[in-house]
């Protein structure tokens, strides 16, 4: 975190520097002009994590400033959603005078939504007992007069859900509303409004598509659910069980009937497609019946492994969302041999940082 860089008045300048840096870094691939999708300059993060500092009777949130090399008190936090900032104030007022709730509390995580739900996770360096549960239940009841809130307590090998451990986000994407179950302690897009722009860009990039779509690393179905409208069928893979469970919920609640989720890694799926190995999880699924002309990938920061990259290269069109320009550039060295970049986008998920989220559409040469 660099608090000094978080100045909304300099946001446009910082974003322009990112655009220039990105265009220069990828100039060798003769990309089209970068499509730039800006963030809100403040209150854009839907989740935030704070450490807790105990100072006598005082108790406050803090973060570590890497530039100043010191902890910084955070009574409010400019990047966090308005809902998180409101909850920060209300929550700390209740925690301070309560011995049970504050005892050995070392971290608080917030997960909020545009739909108005918020999840608060309290993390402790002690085991949670009946007194904690009673006080946390009373806390939830009091906060519920102002917020649509759920509370989770965590300690070593212990997790207490007072109600549920997820929120349901509602995103307006073009003329459609999509609902997404987001589970505590699982990956979700941090900047909801930029996430909407990413979905709309991906939908536009795949308009008038032929055949089916294959998606690797689908998470909770964020993209595959929105993109299903552009394809006959969608086949998606994800390894993390909580994400797969959330994806199945999201498929049902959004009424998507042409999307199949398989729980397996991209590497294993590559082996299955190459018929190197058979997998019980694929029983009843006829991979050969899918006519996938388009593949969508949103890999982790490490990028795409060599075997999967070879698989990806076999498709006419590749839609690649990247959270790491360095590994995207490395992957493009190979993909550029057979495909040409026809669209290139910068999504500013993380203002005031060096982080750049990018989107690339590649089409066979």
From Swiss-Prot:
What InterPro entries does this protein map onto? MeTrfase_TrmA_AS, MeTrfase_TrmA_CS, SAM-dependent_MTases_sf, TrmA_MeTrfase, U5_MeTrfase_fam
* Residues that bind S-adenosyl-L-methionine: 189, 217, 222, 238, 298
So where's the catalytic machinery, residue-wise? 323 (nucleophile), 357 (proton acceptor)
UniProt keywords (A-Z) are: Methyltransferase, S-adenosyl-L-methionine, Transferase, tRNA processing
Looking up CDD domains in the UniProt record yields: AdoMet_MTases
MF (Gene Ontology): rRNA binding; tRNA (uracil(54)-C5)-methyltransferase activity, S-adenosyl methionine-dependent; tRNA binding
In the Enzyme Commission scheme, what number(s) does this protein have? 2.1.1.-, 2.1.1.35
Q: Which GO terms describe its cellular component?
A: cytosol
Q: Which reaction does it catalyse?
A: uridine(54) in tRNA + S-adenosyl-L-methionine = 5-methyluridine(54) in tRNA + S-adenosyl-L-homocysteine + H(+); uridine(341) in tmRNA + S-adenosyl-L-methionine = 5-methyluridine(341) in tmRNA + S-adenosyl-L-homocysteine + H(+)
Matching entries from SUPFAM superfamilies are given as: S-adenosyl-L-methionine-dependent methyltransferases
Write out the GO biological process terms. Answer: tRNA methylation
Family indicated by similarity:
Belongs to the class I-like SAM-binding methyltransferase superfamily. RNA M5U methyltransferase family. TrmA subfamily.
Q: Which PANTHER family match?
A: TRNA/TMRNA (URACIL-C(5))-METHYLTRANSFERASE, TRNA_TMRNA (URACIL-C(5))-METHYLTRANSFERASE
The protein's job, in short, is: Dual-specificity methyltransferase that catalyzes the formation of 5-methyluridine at position 54 (m5U54) in all tRNAs, and that of position 341 (m5U341) in tmRNA (transfer-mRNA).
Q: What is this protein called?
A: tRNA/tmRNA (uracil-C(5))-methyltransferase
